[in-house]
């Protein structure tokens, strides 16, 4: 979530095919099958955060929201033909800064999804938002058109850290936005970034305890990483930015687990914590290797077709993507069928991030061979992985060396 100058469309009047009270939207007749997700990428921001390498863009001259909406709806038509008769369990508006979209735009996209597929009665519909006062004023509109989960990009709880991270809001605005979000939405998540420059274990413990006291049902807690091509990377390479690494980074991660679990928000994924039952259903689709359609500039998709997994991605430039959609009906610039080995490696990579781990039988079914028993037994004996009930999971010690585990198991 990360900010822009957009003229929003008005909120439309209620429509007969739309319900926002938990009822199923008018669907096409379809068979029930594995959950399917739709990710919608809104790429525009008010400002680019110096640590961010996401596909986000600043347009000081404003954005033609109506024209972009027409492109989103047209690309949805295309994906409906690629993945027909699916049951949509989640919709996720990400970015960029989706809270710069008008509620009318969000509503039209949800309606289009409901018209193309079955939108499940209890579908999770998440929108990422920044906590600025202007964007917080839109929360009621988003709830009215069907959004039922809000994810706030808080990132830090003190003004000095927010300024260092290039954020556009203050700590007071963040707390006010969080309180407002909890009034409008039953499910609220917010993000924090830790392992920031100069941050000590004591300071992070105090900040995290404060965050846990706000009683959101989901927290995403990310260690700051230096991403190539960002202003932070340039400063880091020049010796002007120093972030915790090694033993301190490890200590901060362990401290995070020690504080969150007793507070009722255990880690269900490396960086994500939730009260049981409040996990992000959309992100679980990714980590469980299930299918999803990615709509918008730079969005990625995974769609099973003919028993094989297709990996699709779109043009990153917003205007370039829109031009292609207007000309061809979609903005895709890559459509690759993964080999059995590639699909298995991806399932391994994603599944080991989860506390629940991955299904070993499913992994073996993907590539026909499964994992090397000798390597697996060695990692078990080192206390890095566990096998139980046909599932493989990284232990807390294993999650500290997750990249090593994946490399060894995928070899």
Feature locations, PLM:
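Flexible, acidic/Gly-rich N-terminal and inter-domain linker regions that tether
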Residues: 1-37, 46, 382
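C-terminal scaffold of the Radical SAM
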Residues: 28-37, 55-82, 86-369
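Conserved N-terminal Rossmann-fold NAD(P)-binding element of oxidoreductases
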Residues: 40
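Local cysteine-cluster metal-coordination motifs and their immediate loop/turn environment
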Residues: 43-56
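Short amphipathic alpha-helical interaction segments
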Residues: 367-381
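A short, conserved structural fragment
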Residues: 380-390
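Minor-groove-contacting beta-hairpin "wing" of winged helix-turn-helix DNA-binding domains
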Residues: 391-395
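Short, amphipathic alpha-helical interaction segments positioned at domain boundaries
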Residues: 397-411
């Amino acid at each position: 979530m990360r900010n822009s100058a957009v003229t929003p469309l008005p909120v439309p009047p209620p429509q007969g095919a739309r319900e926002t009270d938990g009822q199923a939207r008018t669907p096409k007749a379809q068979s029930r099958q594995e959950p399917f997700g739709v990710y919608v990428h809104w790429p525009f921001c008010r400002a680019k955060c110096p640590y961010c390498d996401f596909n986000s863009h600043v347009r000081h001259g404003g954005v033609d929201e109506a024209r972009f909406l027409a492109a989103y709806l047209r690309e949805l038509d295309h994906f409906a033909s690629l993945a027909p008769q699916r049951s949509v369990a989640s919709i996720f508006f990400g970015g960029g800064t989706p809270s710069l979209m008008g509620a009318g735009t969000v509503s039209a996209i949800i309606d289009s999804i409901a018209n193309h597929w079955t939108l499940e009665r209890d579908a999770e519909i998440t929108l990422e938002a920044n906590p600025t006062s202007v964007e917080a004023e839109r929360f009621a509109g988003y709830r009215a058109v069907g959004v039922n989960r809000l994810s706030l990009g808080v990132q830090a709880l003190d003004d000095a850290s927010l300024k260092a991270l290039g954020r556009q809001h203050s700590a007071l605005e963040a707390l006010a936005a969080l309180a407002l979000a909890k009034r409008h939405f039953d499910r609220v998540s917010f993000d924090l970034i830790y392992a920031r420059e100069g941050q000590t274990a004591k300071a992070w413990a105090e900040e995290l305890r404060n965050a846990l006291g706000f009683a959101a049902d989901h927290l995403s807690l990310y260690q700051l990483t230096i991403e190539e091509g960002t202003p932070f990377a340039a400063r880091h390479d020049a010796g002007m930015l120093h972030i915790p690494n090694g033993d301190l980074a490890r200590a901060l991660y362990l401290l995070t687990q020690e504080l969150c679990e007793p507070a009722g928000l255990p880690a269900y994924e490396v960086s994500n914590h939730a009260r049981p039952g409040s996990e992000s259903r959309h992100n679980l689709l990714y980590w469980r290797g299930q299918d999803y359609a990615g709509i918008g500039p730079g969005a990625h998709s995974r769609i099973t077709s003919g028993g094989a997994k297709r990996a699709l991605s779109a043009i990153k430039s917003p205007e370039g993507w829109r031009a292609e959609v207007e000309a061809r009906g979609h903005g895709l610039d890559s459509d690759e069928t993964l080999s059995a080995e590639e699909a298995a490696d991806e399932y391994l990579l994603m599944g080991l991030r989860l506390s629940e781990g991955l299904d070993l039988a499913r992994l073996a079914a993907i590539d026909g061979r499964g994992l090397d028993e000798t390597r697996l037994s060695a990692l078990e004996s080192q206390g890095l992985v566990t096998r139980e009930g046909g599932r493989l999971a990284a232990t807390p010690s294993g999650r500290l060396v997750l990249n090593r585990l994946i490399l060894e198991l995928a070899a």
